[in-house]
Amino acid sequence: MKTTVEKLSPTRVKLAISATPEDLKPHIDHAYGHIAEQVAIPGFRKGKVPPPIIDQRVGREAVLEHAVNDGMDGFYQAAVKETDIRPLGRPEADVKEWPGKDLTGDLLLEIEVDVRPEFDLPAYEGLELTVDSVEVTDDEVATELDSLRSRFGTLITVDRPAKTGDFVQIDLTATIAGNAVDTASGISYELGSGDLIDGIDEALESLTAGESTTFESKLLGGDNEGETAEIAVTVQSVKERELPEADDDFAQIASEFDTIDELRADLKVQVGKSKVFGQVTQARDQIVDKLLEGVEIPVPEKLVEDEVQRHLENENRLEDDVHRAEVKESSEKAFRQQLLLDVIAEKEELKVSQDELTQYLIQGAQQYNMEPNEFVQVLQQNNQIPAMVGEVARNKALAVVLDKAKVVDADGKVVDVTEFTQPVVRDADAPVEEPADADAEAVVADAPAEEAVAEEAPAEKPKKKAPAKKKAAEKAADSE
């Protein structure tokens, strides 16, 4: 097999592949075997039909097309490996020349595919990043202390109208067209939390125990989900939360500290860390924008257009040209950002350990309120585990750049970001490998090791353009 590469653009190439009859022979044999299993010919058992009879009854053209379809992906994968291109997206294949009916002559394929563009990585050591200045106020510390006190508060029944922050015990009845469709009794609800149906807070405000009222709202579940119903609510009791005194006794009960002053000091530190994390997030957002300003990264138009089309189809907004332009701009920036971080990860020789991938997957599962193994199974079914490895690697690349940057606030004060950038593992003890038959528990818990840097799109199977001939063979070719 011979392969040549023609560069069509910085992001697209054409592979010209010439496969000899010897290259195609294993696929010819497979085609005869497969067709023999599919056809029913009197006098022959399935799977036992000899090639000459298949040529006579089905046609040599059907065998050839079946063989080409069977071998095309292998030829493409070999060409990718031979030429060292880095494919992005789905390739498109065209059969330029078919072997003769006597199986002589080469098979000539032309395959176009988007590829990762080459670009000069901008310098990222010593980037200067300016973030907002922050300070911790006494009011913020007091708010944190009150939040902690509320965890140790007690509920006291009160004889007065309910107000925001009170806990009420209520009974609910939903009615549609005069028919009760749902009821609930003895529900404990914190007024103002917004955890129940719309309108409940306004309805309960100023009601006392034993009083009732009605209001309209859309139902959030059940057989009548989404329908508007009349909601009757009765207050059974009103309770307020009584907070413990903020003194040394409370500090000893609620924390590791002996005095309330020590507890307040620790809360101030925690609030400060939270604000520094906000500064770090701000710095991370600046990093990519600053780096992208210093480099021109070509974007594969077809890859982006396909992504835009999928996005608009999912939103059912194909005719919205303004939104299309917005999505295209966002997709192009996301591609450049991803590629930039991929190259940094490769330059820094970053690898993703199994523990790092596991933690990332667990966080993703929590975000979607799923069990980790269930979350991983969904990712595996959609072949998304490699993408997750890539995301972890990009996060590590960001951390490396941030670690090398100089971050100051608006007042010129240096911001210490080391807590959020160290350690960055380069030579991971157990780099990730995603075996083809790995189960969910293996991915979450204990996968084998392999180098894993930033995600690279796998060399997908070529999407073959309709051939100019061989139409009579389509049924046999599609029966695989």
From Swiss-Prot:
NCBIfam families listed in its UniProt record: tig (TIGR00115)
UniProt KW Isomerase keyword: yes
Predominant localisation class: cytoplasm
InterPro entries, per database record: PPIase_dom_sf, PPIase_FKBP_dom, Trig_fac, Trigger_fac_C, Trigger_fac_C_sf, Trigger_fac_ribosome-bd_bac, Trigger_fac_ribosome-bd_sf, Trigger_fact/SurA_dom_sf
Entry keyword set: Cell cycle, Cell division, Chaperone, Cytoplasm, Isomerase, Rotamase
EC number: 5.2.1.8
Catalysed reaction, written as an equation: [protein]-peptidylproline (omega=180) = [protein]-peptidylproline (omega=0)
Domain PPIase FKBP-type: 165-244
Role played: Involved in protein export. Acts as a chaperone by maintaining the newly synthesized protein in an open conformation. Functions as a peptidyl-prolyl cis-trans isomerase.
Localization (cell): Cytoplasm
UniProt free text on domains: Consists of 3 domains; the N-terminus binds the ribosome, the middle domain has PPIase activity, while the C-terminus has intrinsic chaperone activity on its own.
Segments of this protein annotated with the region Disordered: 447-480
Keyword Isomerase annotated: yes
A cellular component annotation (GO) from this entry: cytoplasm
Entry's Gene Ontology molecular function annotations: peptidyl-prolyl cis-trans isomerase activity; protein folding chaperone; ribosome binding
Name of protein: Trigger factor
Bias kind Basic and acidic residues: ranges: 471-480
Family of the protein in this entry: Belongs to the FKBP-type PPIase family. Tig subfamily.
GO biological process: 'de novo' cotranslational protein folding; cell division; chaperone-mediated protein folding; protein transport; protein unfolding
